[in-house]
């Protein structure tokens, strides 16, 4: 895929998948469907670990019915795989934080992050959500930041990811330069992010007509209120909120210079959206 703008993992998997099954449309879409089902199962485990079984049942139910995940779980592209890896990365990270002396989980986390980067570069944008989670768990202060950077397990995960992704780094840089030379993606507007959130909910951006620019702030305000009301769950609430919104905000900002924002690029944020809705309602 060096002549494409996407990383290679999905294409490698598809090559193997076709050799085992066939190259029919149903077969190719079957892989994405499998990823979608596994995403819902892993989201259940993640929400159960972060909150409760009730929230997990509700959140995974919403995800199973979520039109955005359904749409891209039926398409022969890498977005369903990206969503699966985003949930897998986050779940493994939570377990690694809980078992901080278990190097296996930190190494596995580093491997999953690498697989995520080999699937969709923008998956790196959920890593700040992981950082905020461990920062809050360690006290949410300057000492916590120092402790994070002193943690050998954190460096184990980072080193694993760096070494495994290093061979592809020159290709990624080359792909980035080609995109900067001009591409077909439309320009962003002030309604771009609200429209994406609306698509998560109904796969129709018309809800923006009712909520407009207020949709992202509403999510942040509710998250803030719930985090203050339930300190036990503040890290869990913020990891979902940042996972949902920060990638969109970063890519939106980058798109002021040259457009790189498309709704489907954030399929991996959809599980966080459905999880948050479950938390807000539950």
Describe the predicted segments one by one.
Residues 1-282:
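Membrane-proximal helix-loop-helix interfaces that form the catalytic/acceptor-binding platform
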């Amino acid at each position: 895929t060096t002549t494409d703008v996407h990383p290679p993992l999905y294409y490698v998997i598809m090559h193997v998948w076709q050799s085992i099954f066939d190259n029919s449309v149903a077969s190719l879409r079957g892989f994405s469907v499998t990823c979608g089902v596994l995403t819902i199962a892993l989201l259940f485990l993640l929400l159960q670990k972060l909150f409760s079984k009730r929230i997990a049942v509700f959140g995974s139910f919403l995800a199973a019915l979520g039109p955005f995940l359904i749409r891209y779980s039926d398409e022969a592209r890498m977005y369903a795989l990206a969503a699966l890896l985003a949930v897998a990365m986050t779940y493994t990270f939570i377990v690694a934080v809980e078992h901080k002396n278990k190097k296996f989980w930190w190494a596995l986390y580093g491997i999953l992050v690498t697989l995520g980067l080999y699937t969709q570069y923008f998956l790196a944008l959920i890593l700040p959500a992981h950082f905020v989670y461990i920062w809050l768990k360690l006290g949410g202060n300057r000492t916590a930041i120092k402790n994070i950077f002193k943690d050998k397990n954190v460096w184990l995960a980072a080193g694993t990811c760096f070494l495994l992704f290093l061979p592809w780094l020159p290709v990624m840089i080359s792909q980035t330069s080609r995109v900067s030379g001009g591409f077909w993606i439309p320009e962003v507007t002030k309604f771009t992010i609200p429209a994406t959130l609306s698509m998560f909910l109904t796969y129709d951006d018309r809800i923006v007509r009712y909520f407009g620019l207020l949709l992202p702030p509403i999510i942040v305000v509710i998250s803030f209120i719930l985090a203050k009301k339930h300190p036990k769950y503040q890290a869990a609430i913020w990891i979902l909120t940042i996972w949902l919104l920060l990638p969109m905000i970063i890519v939106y900002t980058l798109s002021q210079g040259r457009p790189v924002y498309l709704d489907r690029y954030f399929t991996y944020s959809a599980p966080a959206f459905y999880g948050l809705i479950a938390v807000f309602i539950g």
